[in-house]
Amino acid sequence: LRAIQEQVAGLPWVATARVSRQWPDTLDVTVTEEEPAARWGADGLLNAQGRLFIRHTTHIPAELPRLAGPEGSEAEVAARYVAIHEKLVERGLGIAALELDGRGAWTMLLSNGIGVRLGSQDVDIRLARFFEALDSVVAPVAVDVQVVDMRYTNGFSVGWKQQRSARSTTDEDLPALTRSREA
């Protein structure tokens, strides 16, 4: 029975399997299917625990966020995704993609198309600064923002879309907080 249970549990879409004998000549097999929570790389699937359960598939639900990172980093990237996602949902946003590169640098793409560069050092501090900037500075001009670079020690930079809206951003668009820093 154990060998059968291990074989069934080893199938790609099987999260858990239980095999028991029903006397006299019946096997009872109970299977729980994996539920994909995110894409991994180009064609893999992660479950909610951050476990890569399919390495290559042709059918990937389009609504799943795309996570990526070095081999073996699936759980770390998934945990970071969950932590960031919770804070973004409060603001009506989500994560379209989150990546950890081979040097340990984090980048993400928000559901509204804004890219965010977090780098590899002090990521939690940079994320806190990003959420503060998102609420107070970026949100009012989000339609014109292409990327926010948080890799600076005491600030951040904004990369604007090439095709800016008809009106340009003025000092009046920015909150008093940023103007007071210039004084």
Regions found by a protein language model. Give the residues of each.
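Charged, solvent-exposed interaction patches on well-folded alpha/beta domains
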Residues: A3-G10, T16-A183
